């Protein structure tokens, strides 16, 4: 079948058609068979009345099931629609196929949306985002650049229908900002903003230089997910082994020789707490459980700290050689050094038009896009 050369949409759909058998065999980038298996497992859990004894666990299971159901249903519907369109195209003469362009464009749009969902399939992607901006090398120019980035991300959030809450803001000594932290609220806010973390470089004739000379300045952006503040520790009876034994200690009239000492073992972690402080077995048990909860709390807190450290990624100095993206205003371009993507409309980028840069960054993070981190001298 000859493709209509004027319709890039047909190329996209036929690319899908040529590879769909491989997708069915392996699950492809969409991993639909795996998602369907996981969805069935979650639906079985939701039917278990005991799950609802823990409202927070039930909420998380419900949310995951809803996301998976949305992806699976969209894929199956799209698969059916595309199959029908492709069969119809096979039957039509070449000159009549262009009439299907609106339907093909809609199918291609849905295909893109589904593909983008696969790029947001990582921990905490669905959560709100905490975004922090700090100026680096460049003095007043860098402080102004940090404020420009703050506006850029605020405009991006507005374009996506997200809410922005200023958490902390410190003005610069002369202009701009010395520090800013905002909370971006919306579905997938963290997922979308996560590839923006890193050092951003600005090159322009400086408005703070009376001679109008070209200046280079830097600002660092950190993006982390908003997570639950409280570390909740739930002691499940089936995860505990409680032993009662005779208290031990130095001899004497006041020695506790009753079977009041209590040892509590937390089976999943192996943490053991023994308490023989009082002659009351009940009080010793209560104290042992309190100590166990405290130790589990600390264990979970450290785990979250390590997870947050991993999410922050490598901390690079906010200076030359560390940048992920350059905004060169006098030469009218923005270049992402990880993905190689270049834009020639920096005014739109700085007004929050970031989606192509973000999708490219997510592809790069997922290992689906090759770029270069080489930075040319300006």
UniProtKB/Swiss-Prot annotation:
Listed NCBIfam families: prfB
Full protein name: Peptide chain release factor RF2
Task performed by this protein: Peptide chain release factor 2 directs the termination of translation in response to the peptide chain termination codons UGA and UAA. In endogenous ribosomes interacts with P-site tRNA and 23S rRNA. In the presence of truncated mRNA in the 70S ribosome, ArfA and RF2 interact such that the GGQ peptide hydrolysis motif of RF2 rises into the peptidyl-transferase center and releases the ribosome. Recruited to stalled E.coli 70S ribosomes by E.coli ArfA, but cannot be functionally accomodated in the peptidyl-transferase center. Note T.thermophilus probably does not encode arfA.
Subunit-structure text: Interacts with the ribosome. Interacts with ribosomal protein L11. Recruited to stalled E.coli ribosomes by E.coli ArfA.
GO terms for MF: rRNA binding; translation release factor activity, codon specific; tRNA binding
UniProt keywords, alphabetically: Cytoplasm, Methylation, Protein biosynthesis, RNA-binding, rRNA-binding, tRNA-binding
PTM sites of type N5-methylglutamine: 253
Alphabetical list of SUPFAM superfamilies matching this protein: Release factor
Subcellular location: Cytoplasm
Family (UniProt): Belongs to the prokaryotic/mitochondrial release factor family.
InterPro entries assigned to the protein according to its UniProt record, in alphabetical order: PCRF (IPR005139), Pep_chain_release_fac_I (IPR000352), Pep_chain_release_fac_I_sf (IPR045853), PrfB (IPR004374)
A GO cellular component annotation in the UniProt record: cytoplasm
């Amino acid at each position: 079948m000859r493709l209509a050369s004027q319709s890039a949409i047909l190329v996209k759909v036929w690319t899908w058609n040529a590879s769909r058998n491989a997708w069915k065999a392996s699950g492809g980038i969409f991993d639909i068979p795996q998602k369907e298996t996981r969805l069935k497992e979650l639906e079985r859990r939701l039917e278990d009345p005991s799950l609802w004894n823990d409202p927070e666990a039930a909420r998380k299971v419900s949310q995951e099931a809803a996301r998976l159901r949305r992806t699976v249903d969209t894929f199956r519907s799209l698969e059916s629609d595309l199959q029908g369109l492709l069969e119809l195209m096979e039957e039509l003469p070449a000159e009549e196929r262009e009439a299907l362009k609106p339907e093909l464009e809609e199918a291609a749009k849905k295909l893109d949306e589904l593909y983008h969902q696969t790029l947001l399939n990582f921990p905490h992607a669905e959560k709100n985002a905490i975004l922090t901006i700090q100026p680096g090398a460049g003095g007043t120019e860098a402080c102004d650049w940090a404020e420009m980035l703050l506006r850029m991300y605020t405009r991006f959030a507005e374009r996506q229908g997200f809410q922005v809450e200023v958490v902390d803001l410190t003005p610069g000594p002369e202009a701009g900002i010395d520090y800013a932290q905002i909370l971006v609220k919306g579905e997938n806010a963290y997922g979308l903003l996560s590839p923006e973390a890193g050092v951003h470089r600005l090159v322009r004739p400086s408005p703070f230089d009376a001679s109008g000379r070209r200046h280079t300045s830097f600002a660092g952006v950190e993006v982390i997910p908003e997570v639950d503040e409280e570390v909740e520790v739930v002691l499940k009876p089936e995860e505990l082994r409680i032993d009662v034994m005779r208290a031990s200690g130095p001899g004497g009239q006041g020695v506790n020789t009753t079977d009041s000492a209590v040892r509590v073992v937390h089976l999943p972690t192996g943490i053991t707490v023994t308490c023989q402080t009082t002659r009351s077995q009940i009080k010793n048990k209560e104290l042992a459980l309190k100590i166990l909860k405290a130790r589990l709390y600390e264990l979970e807190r450290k785990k979250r700290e390590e997870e947050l450290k991993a999410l922050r990624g490598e901390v690079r100095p906010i200076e030359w050689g560390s940048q992920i993206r350059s905004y060169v205003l006098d030469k009218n371009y923005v270049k992402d050094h990880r993905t190689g993507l270049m834009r020639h409309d920096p005014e739109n980028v700085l007004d929050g038009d970031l989606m192509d840069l973000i999708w490219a960054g997510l592809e790069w993070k997922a290992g689906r896009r090759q770029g270069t981190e080489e930075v040319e001298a300006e």
